[in-house]
Amino acid sequence: MRKILAAVIVFFLVSVNVFAEPFSGVYKTMPSKTTGGWAHVKFGACKENKNFTCGTLIKAFSRDGKAVKNYEHQGKYVVWDMRKEGDKNFSGGKIKDYSDGKVYNSKMEILSKNKIGVSGCVLFICQAQEWSKVK
């Protein structure tokens, strides 16, 4: 009985590890083309569906690198509903550009331990950025 219980516990621990959120951390966005400011986005499991990855804007910076106090979009999703597709790719999600208020279809790719590629597309026109890991 103990061996069966031990096997079940080991299986459960391995299963949790396999399905654990594969992508997390805080990333610095590229500077905005319109304002020159950038943000720190914290990635993790979405609150609404833990199987998807979301990115929350946790801090905004002005062109000169100073933190923007009481930024109106702080705490909101920038990226949401990303589904894991293979080891390094995510798709099916959305990304919001708060400088113009538009929402785009989005994909992400883990480029290295400290960089991700994020793209937003309308039809077949896409724009991509590389974001660097902060934490």
Each language-model region and where it sits:
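Short, exposed beta-strand-loop hairpins at the edges of beta-sheets
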Residues: 97-99, 105-128
